[in-house]
Regions:
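Sec-dependent bacterial lipoprotein signal peptides
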Residues: 1-18
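Short loop/turn and low-complexity linker motifs enriched in small/turn-promoting residues
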Residues: 16-141
């Protein structure tokens, strides 16, 4: 009985956690959901955002925000690259307000400042777990 109880607790704690997509399984965000920052910039940098598999809200898109404007609508297992000008950028994630289902009715607004230099590359993951909910973190090489 204790073993069953321990297994139940473990499944509840890890049940909504996401996991990193294997590089060969990452899909690009389709062009119709890439809304800005797609033109190459000679003196800019690149931001790559990927979304883990599984987790809470797996059936919903998440809005990727650059300088507080929607740059893409990203699904699970997808990745997008953004070409951004040099300077301090604000990278964030939020609710996909283009979605008129329950997915677009929640609350999510996380931002972080990012210093972009010419030729720099920055990578981030959108993750989920039972404690933090949905969040974005830099990819550790």
């Amino acid at each position: 009985m204790r073993l069953i109880g321990a297994a139940l607790v473990l499944s509840l704690v890890t049940g909504c956690s996401s996991w990193k997509v294997a590089p060969e399984d990452i899909r690009p965000v389709p062009a119709d959901r890439l809304l800005s920052h797609q033109q190459p910039l000679a003196t800019g940098g690149q931001i790559t955002v990927s979304r883990d598999l599984g987790g809470m809200g797996a059936g919903c898109y998440i809005a990727v925000l650059i300088d507080r404007k929607v740059a893409a609508r990203i699904g699970v297992g997808e990745e997008a690259q953004f070409q951004v000008p040099v300077g301090t950028r604000v990278l964030g994630i939020g609710i996909d307000k283009a979605d008129d289902t329950l997915c677009g009715k929640g609350r999510l607004n996380l931002e972080q400042a990012l210093s972009v230099e010419a030729g720099s590359q920055h990578a981030f993951r959108i993750r989920t777990d039972n404690i933090k909910g949905v969040y974005i973190t830099p990819v550790e090489e």
